[in-house]
């Protein structure tokens, strides 16, 4: 197996689904009741994918999903001969785990994903200068 993806669904939503097209990879989707719901187009894509993910339900708590994900990753590093372990998350807190394992010769990395596919796309509003602020009517 080439890669195992550890997906932080609380953080990236369903933006990982397009990764399912990668052959010879395994997908572990960690989720809680706080994970965003999957939209119908992504659900259809998921159902039609030949590479089916495994879903890992996590206990909720402060950073609960994150701790369970890295525990699972550490366990798999010990028992699996996968070439690459990939954490799919925008949470830079995982970078410490990545550096920890890389210092020990393991091929672990974190890749960010845009979660715009399952949430509203927010407009970025340019900040206004003090001259543009209306202070009285």
Model-identified regions with their sequence ranges:
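Terminal and domain-boundary accessory regions
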Residues: 1-137
